[in-house]
């Protein structure tokens, strides 16, 4: 009993008898408010605990031979699909001018609604080809005229594109498609006129080498001439080229939680005709490791935009269109998901309860003793 009596001396929470306790309305109000505050802060701490923590790390990118996937969804409200070509090239010298897969063009009306029920697949760098004649009716061994543009290695022009290519090799302007039988047969002029007031949506993805390069959207047929990439714009009027565009989505690789693509939802209006828009993109290779161990290899990027007026078809002034020029950072970012510490959560909850309880006690004491002091003064005033 002696030891128990000594132990009681260490009690930091002495109790008072029920008869000596005073309960007030002010104390009840403080208790209710402090309880609600504790409840709100508890759920806030719980929500914070349940969210995953991201730990960033920085490494030198040692990956080699990988491909870079470029996801594209861009709308050109004033550029018909028949006029638009998309090309990709890199510093290693690889060019993609005739890609058939993974990229689509959708014709749009003035309200940006699809003209057809489904998107047509196109080759990058080529205009649409709607065959309006029966190919079986033509001799497969035929050799049609190139209208004076024949060469030793290019003597037959059986399609409108063949004639355009022959003219291009000669350096001639392709201005009179209606006088060329192949183009008349394929309805080249009708197709161009039919889409004159339409827009175009380009969507899909490209796979390129993981080196610096660019891809661009520009009017006219693209080709190489003396190791220079050019577009045939001689059949277009520069005053008719409106490169207003809306980038609905542009990313380099797979999405991961929290990824922000800075160009998504951006819209740029061309204030003049024949504008050249350049997007300079810095790509940072990124590895995202989920809590379950799944690894996502992707990229994040930053971008700056530059625009200028072009006055020439070919030359130092540039080409009208939208150009995305990208380069890769030598550093790699690794983002690792981890669960938050339960002990940290427990510490936070204890701090919330103890802190609110202590502050509430101080407020209650202040209110109680202030009220008593005022009441005593009032009573003394009445007595005198």
Curated annotation (Swiss-Prot):
Q: Which Pfam families match?
A: COPIIcoated_ERV, ERGIC_N
The record's similarity note reads: Belongs to the ERGIC family.
Which stretches are transmembrane? 26-46, 343-363
Instruction: Give the CC-aspect GO terms.
Output: endoplasmic reticulum membrane; endoplasmic reticulum-Golgi intermediate compartment membrane; Golgi apparatus
Record topology, Cytoplasmic segments? 1-25, 364-384
Stored InterPro entries = Erv, Erv_C, Erv_N
What does this protein's UniProt record list under function? Possible role in transport between endoplasmic reticulum and Golgi.
Q: Which residues lie on this side of the membrane: Lumenal?
A: 47-342
| Cell compartments where the protein resides | Endoplasmic reticulum-Golgi intermediate compartment membrane; Golgi apparatus, cis-Golgi network membrane; Endoplasmic reticulum membrane
Its BP terms in the Gene Ontology are: intracellular transport; vesicle-mediated transport
Q: What is this protein called?
A: Endoplasmic reticulum-Golgi intermediate compartment protein 3
Keywords tagged on the record: Endoplasmic reticulum, ER-Golgi transport, Golgi apparatus, Membrane, Transmembrane, Transmembrane helix, Transport
Recorded topology in the membrane: Multi-pass membrane protein
Give the top-rank taxon of the lineage listed in the UniProt record for this protein.
Eukaryota
């Amino acid at each position: 009993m002696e030891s128990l009596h000594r132990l009681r001396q260490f009690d930091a929470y002495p109790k008072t008898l029920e008869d000596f306790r005073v309960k007030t309305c002010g104390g009840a109000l403080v208790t209710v408010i402090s309880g609600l505050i504790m409840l709100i802060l508890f759920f806030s701490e719980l929500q914070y605990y349940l969210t995953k923590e991201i730990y960033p790390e920085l490494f030198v990118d040692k990956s080699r031979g990988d491909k870079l996937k470029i996801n594209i969804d861009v709308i050109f409200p004033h550029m018909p699909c028949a006029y638009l070509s998309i090309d990709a090239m890199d510093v290693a010298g690889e060019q993609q001018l005739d890609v058939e897969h993974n990229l689509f063009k959708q014709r749009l009306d003035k309200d940006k609604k699809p003209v057809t029920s489904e998107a047509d697949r196109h080759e990058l760098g080529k205009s649409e080809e709607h065959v309006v004649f029966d190919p079986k009716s033509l001799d497969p061994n035929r050799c049609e005229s190139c209208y004076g543009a024949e060469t030793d290695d290019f003597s037959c022009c059986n399609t409108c594109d063949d004639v355009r290519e022959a003219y291009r090799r000669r350096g001639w302007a392709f201005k009179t498609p209606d006088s060329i039988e192949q183009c008349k047969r394929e309805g080249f002029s009708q197709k161009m006129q039919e889409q004159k007031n339409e827009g175009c949506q380009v969507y899909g993805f490209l796979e390129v080498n993981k080196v610096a390069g660019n891809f661009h959207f520009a009017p006219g047929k693209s080709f190489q001439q003396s190791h220079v990439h050019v577009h045939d714009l001689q059949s277009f009027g520069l005053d008719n080229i409106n490169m207003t565009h809306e980038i609905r989505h542009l990313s380099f690789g797979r999405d991961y939680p929290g990824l922000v693509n800075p160009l998504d939802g951006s819209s740029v209006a061309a204030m003049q005709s024949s504008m050249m828009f350049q997007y300079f993109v810095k790509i940072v290779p990124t590895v995202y490791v989920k809590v379950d161990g799944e690894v996502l290899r992707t990229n994040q990027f930053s971008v700056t935009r530059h625009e200028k007026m072009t006055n020439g078809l070919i030359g130092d002034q540039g080409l009208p269109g939208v150009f995305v020029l990208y380069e890769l950072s030598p550093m790699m970012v690794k983002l690792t998901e981890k669960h938050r510490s339960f002990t940290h959560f427990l510490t936070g909850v204890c701090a919330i309860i103890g802190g609110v309880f202590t502050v509430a006690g101080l407020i209650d004491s202040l209110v109680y003793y202030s009220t008593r002091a005022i009441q005593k003064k009032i009573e003394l005033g009445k007595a005198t």
